[in-house]
UniProtKB/Swiss-Prot annotation:
Its main location: cytoplasm. Belongs to the methyltransferase superfamily. RsmH family. S-adenosyl-L-methionine binds at residues 33-35, 51, 78, 96, 103. This is Ribosomal RNA small subunit methyltransferase H. Its EC number is 2.1.1.199. HAMAP family: 16SrRNA_methyltr_H (MF_01007). GO terms for biological process: rRNA base methylation. The gene is rsmH.
C-alpha cells in the first residue's frame, strides 16, 4: 500500500499540467511521490520521476510496483538529468522546489530545527555539509549567504554570533545552530521561528538549489514537446523570481492586432513559451490551515508553442 503524502497545491498543479491518457510526464522532484502518484491516478499516462536523494528509492519502488511500466524512476538531480533521459521528450514537466516533508521530518537528515540531529542538510548525501560550511566559512561569507538565500535582515548579527560560538565549541547539531540564531535575534512567541530563514539559506546554499534550477531551465526546451506544459511550484522569492523571469524572457507579449492586418508577423523561435498563469497562483487559506508548509508556495505554468 502506497503511503499518503500531503503535496502542496496538488489540485492546482494537475489543472495546470492537464495530464492526458497516453502522454508522458516528467516529475523532476519526486520526494515522497505525491505529484507522481496524482498524475498517474488522473489518467492512463506515463511518469518518469527524478530525485537525487537515495532515501526516496524505496518509495519509488512502491509506486513502481503499483503502476508497473507506467512509472520509471531515475536517481539524479534535475539539472544533470538531460544526459540520463537520453533525448526523451515529455508532454509535461513539473518541479516542486525546496525540501520535502519526508526530509524535514527525519532528524538525521539535519534539515529541520524542530528535530535535533546532525547538521547535514545535503539532499544527496554528497558534497559540502551544513556543518562543514557553518564551522569553516568566514563571517562575511556566512552573513552574505544568510542574507541572500534567507532574506534575513539580521544576517550580520547571526554570522557574528556563529563565529563567536565556534571559538568555544563546534556547531554540529541542528539544535545548536537554532539556539545560536535565536539568541542572536530573540524569540517571539507566536511568530515564525527566528531560525527559519537561516536554515533555509544554508540548505539552499549547500545544495546549490538556485544554480540547479537555472541550469535546468536553460535546457528544458530540449525535453519539452510542442504544446507541452511546464509547471513550477516554488517556496522562496528567489526561486519564484528565477522562474518568473525565465517565463517572461522566453514568451511573446500578447499583441492586439487589427483583423485587417496581414498575417506577416515573424516568428521568433526564442520566444517559445506561452504563459498560462499571468500571476503566480497561491495556495488557498484552507490548504495553508491544513498544511502550514504551504504558506509560501507559488505556482507558475507555461506552455511550449514551438519545439
Amino acid at each position: 500500500m502506497i503511503q499518503s503524502h500531503v503535496s502542496v497545491m496538488l489540485n492546482e498543479m494537475l489543472e495546470a499540467l492537464s495530464p492526458k491518457a497516453g502522454e508522458s510526464y516528467l516529475d523532476c522532484t519526486f520526494g515522497a511521490g505525491g505529484y507522481s502518484k496524482a498524475i498517474l491516478e488522473s489518467c492512463n499516462c506515463y511518469v518518469t520521476a527524478l530525485d537525487r536523494d537515495p532515501n526516496v528509492i524505496k518509495r519509488a519502488e512502491e509506486i513502481q510496483q503499483h503502476y508497473g511500466e507506467r512509472f520509471d524512476f531515475v536517481e539524479t538531480n534535475f539539472a544533470d538529468s538531460f544526459a540520463k533521459l537520453k533525448e526523451k521528450k515529455f508532454d509535461g514537466i513539473v518541479l516542486d522546489l525546496g525540501v520535502s516533508s519526508m526530509q524535514l521530518d527525519i532528524a538525521d537528515r539535519g534539515f529541520s530545527f524542530l528535530h535535533d540531529g546532525p547538521l547535514d542538510m545535503r539532499m544527496s548525501g554528497q558534497g559540502l555539509s551544513a556543518e562543514e560550511f557553518v564551522n569553516a566559512a568566514e563571517e562575511k561569507e556566512l552573513a552574505d549567504v544568510i542574507y541572500k538565500y534567507g532574506d534575513e535582515s539580521f544576517s550580520r548579527r547571526i554570522a557574528k554570533r556563529i563565529v563567536e560560538y565556534r571559538k568555544t565549541a563546534r556547531i554540529d547539531s541542528t539544535s545548536k545552530l537554532a539556539e545560536i540564531v535565536r539568541s542572536s535575534i530573540g524569540f517571539r512567541k507566536g511568530k515564525i521561528d527566528p531560525a527559519t530563514k537561516t536554515f533555509q539559506a544554508i540548505r539552499i546554499y549547500v545544495n546549490d538549489e538556485l544554480g540547479e534550477l537555472e541550469q535546468f531551465l536553460v535546457n528544458v526546451k530540449n525535453i519539452l514537446k510542442k504544446d507541452g506544459r511546464l509547471v513550477v511550484v516554488s517556496f522562496h522569492s528567489l526561486e519564484d523570481r528565477i522562474v518568473k523571469n525565465f517565463f517572461k524572457e522566453n514568451s511573446e507579449k500578447p499583441v492586439v492586432r487589427s483583423k485587417y492586418a496581414k498575417d506577416d508577423m515573424t516568428i521568433d523561435p526564442n520566444k517559445w513559451l506561452k504563459i498560462i498563469t499571468n500571476k503566480a497562483l497561491a495556495p488557498s487559506d484552507k490548504e495553508v490551515g491544513l498544511n502550514i508548509r504551504a504558506r509560501s508556495a507559488k505556482l507558475r505554468a507555461a506552455k511550449a508553442i514551438y519545439e
